[in-house]
């Protein structure tokens, strides 16, 4: 488990969405899993700053409809300055398309 992510550092990680939303009702599951994904990333990196989900990742989460979400997703998390406020930092999450999730570990891509 990573303790803190530094400025302009990029980390790729796999998030098990089935585990995150196991207790959610099947109605409006995709909209709630976006909030749960943001909370999971904040908890993983021990950060209290905001998390920005890109359009590609959001479209992937809604690709099977609002009731059926994907089981796992591979994301690339980068700590950047906010577009709204230059003094604040945010965790930006991008979608990483992979063929299989087998034997994928967390890796630091850029520093």
Curated annotation (Swiss-Prot):
<dbReference type="GO" id="GO:0003735">
    <property type="term" value="F:structural constituent of ribosome"/>
</dbReference>
<dbReference type="GO" id="GO:0005840">
    <property type="term" value="C:ribosome"/>
</dbReference>
<dbReference type="InterPro" id="IPR023621">
    <property type="entry name" value="Ribosomal_eL31_dom_sf"/>
</dbReference>
<dbReference type="GO" id="GO:1990904">
    <property type="term" value="C:ribonucleoprotein complex"/>
</dbReference>
<dbReference type="Pfam" id="PF01198">
    <property type="entry name" value="Ribosomal_L31e"/>
</dbReference>
<keyword id="KW-0689">Ribosomal protein</keyword>
<dbReference type="GO" id="GO:0006412">
    <property type="term" value="P:translation"/>
</dbReference>
<comment type="similarity">
    <text>Belongs to the eukaryotic ribosomal protein eL31 family.</text>
</comment>
<protein>
    <recommendedName>
        <fullName>Large ribosomal subunit protein eL31</fullName>
    </recommendedName>
</protein>
<keyword id="KW-0687">Ribonucleoprotein</keyword>
<dbReference type="InterPro" id="IPR000054">
    <property type="entry name" value="Ribosomal_eL31"/>
</dbReference>
